[in-house]
Amino acid sequence: FYIYGEVQRPGAFRLSREMTVMQALATGGGTTARGTTKGLQIHRRDEIGRISVVEPRLSDHLQPNDVIFVRESLF
């Protein structure tokens, strides 16, 4: 998976079996002081190559090649 935006260590990481969004955020070092877990987005490619945007819960499991975007908090 790949994680970018307001995280301490953006980049590509190995997806562990049954990894949740919360565990992925921890792998990326957590959010920055400006980041928020509200409004997270996962960009996910389907079998025919279309990309959909999913707003996950922290307990949702990742899929191979998911891209997580962490937004900046407005407050």
What is each model feature region?
Residues 1-75:
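Ser/Thr/Pro/Gly-biased, low-complexity, turn-/loop-rich segments
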